[in-house]
A protein has these predicted regions:
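Non-catalytic, soluble scaffold/interaction modules
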Residues: 1-108
Length: 108
């Protein structure tokens, strides 16, 4: 899957699909958070996540800017990450190239 390279770095971890702020309690340290987009309310979760993948957004979008501030690899503007990536999948996020690769198809 490809999108916009928004924050450099490479990270491999487990997908956590988060559709909104009401699901923040499900996020665990090191998760690869996959979401439609972020807003300022999401800033509280950035310090603990391993990487970020969003359906929408560009290089100057909120998720891209905040990910860069926190040094978190991020790929934004994938179009359909929340539909394609599944909870518990192991993925590698390459925020330098704008690529998300599924490491395996096993689920937790």
């Amino acid at each position: 899957m490809t999108g916009t390279a928004a924050s450099p770095g490479r990270y491999t971890g487990v997908v956590r699909v988060v559709m909104g702020e009401h699901e923040f309690g499900r996020i665990r340290a090191g998760d690869v958070v996959v979401c439609p987009v972020t807003s300022p309310a999401w800033s509280v979760v950035f310090p603990s996540i391993g990487a970020l993948v969003t359906d929408s957004g560009g290089i100057l979008s909120h998720p891209a800017i905040i990910a860069r501030e926190h040094g978190i690899p991020a790929v934004v503007g994938t179009g359909n990450a929340t539909d394609i990536l599944k909870e518990g999948q192991r993925v590698t996020v390459d925020g330098s190239r704008g690529v998300v690769e599924v490491a395996d198809s096993a689920h937790r």
